[in-house]
């Protein structure tokens, strides 16, 4: 999976190669490219300050993501197997579902500061209440009695939370930000309909850097 994650770092669409081995063979033939990649890897590793931990979900034995690591959405979609070498996930929603190792799961993608489209009435209230509790709103169509609502209430899916400050920001030269993987969450409480308001319990406390913006910037 990590090789496929690298593929989506290098290419913006699926199907550029018939196999990952062919990709590596082609890239290794370009000595200049190989040297540049080695140099870039060293630079990025020296800049990396994320204190990653082992995954805490049911998928920990085969999951390529590290708890509190930072990942692009494309990388996450590879990890949850909604993107393959020949087909890229078309999802642009804030949630994505699949079944991994026979276990139904759902990935929640949260921007604390929303990038609202002009004329949109959508303003989800997603924020950290504490370092281990996260308030999250479903999509506007979800009711408690709906299949989706019931899956949240009954805990029939392994829920994984991914959070970032916002999609892009001036301090990051408007580059798209990655998501911090906060790991497995379980239901604490719920109320309301269309949307439902849910509080999730984090199995592992979120990093202080995430809590700082997730608790204070939600209403910006």
Set out the residue ranges of the language-model regions.
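Compact mixed alphabeta submodule
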Residues: 171-220
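Intrinsically disordered, low-complexity N-terminal regions enriched in serine/proline/glycine
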Residues: 6-10, 123, 178-180
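Acidic, glycine-rich low-complexity segments with interspersed aromatic residues
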Residues: 66-178
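Short linear sequence elements within intrinsically disordered, low-complexity coil regions
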Residues: 12-16, 22, 29, 37, ...
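C-terminal helical accessory/scaffold domains
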Residues: 1-63
């Amino acid at each position: 999976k990590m090789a496929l994650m690298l593929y989506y770092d290098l290419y913006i669409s699926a199907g550029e190669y018939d196999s990952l081995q062919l990709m590596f063979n082609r890239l290794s033939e370009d000595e200049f490219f190989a040297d540049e990649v080695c140099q870039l890897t060293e630079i990025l590793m020296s800049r990396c300050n994320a204190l990653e931990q082992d995954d805490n979900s049911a998928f920990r034995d085969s999951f390529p993501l590290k708890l509190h690591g930072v990942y692009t959405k494309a990388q996450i979609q590879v990890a949850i197997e909604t993107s393959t070498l020949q087909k890229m996930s078309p999802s642009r929603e804030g949630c994505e579902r699949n079944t991994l190792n026979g276990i139904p799961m759902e990935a929640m993608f949260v921007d604390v500061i929303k990038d609202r489209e002009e004329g949109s009435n959508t303003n989800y209230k997603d924020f950290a209440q504490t370092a281990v509790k996260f308030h999250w709103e479903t999509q506007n169509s979800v009711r408690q009695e709906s299949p989706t609502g019931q899956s949240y209430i009954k805990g029939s899916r392994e829920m994984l939370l991914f959070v970032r400050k916002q999609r892009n920001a001036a301090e990051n030269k408007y580059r798209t930000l990655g998501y911090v993987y906060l790991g497995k969450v379980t239901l604490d409480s719920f109320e309301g309909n269309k949307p439902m308001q849910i509080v999730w319990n984090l199995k592992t406390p979120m990093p202080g850097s995430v809590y700082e913006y997730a608790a204070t910037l939600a209403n910006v």
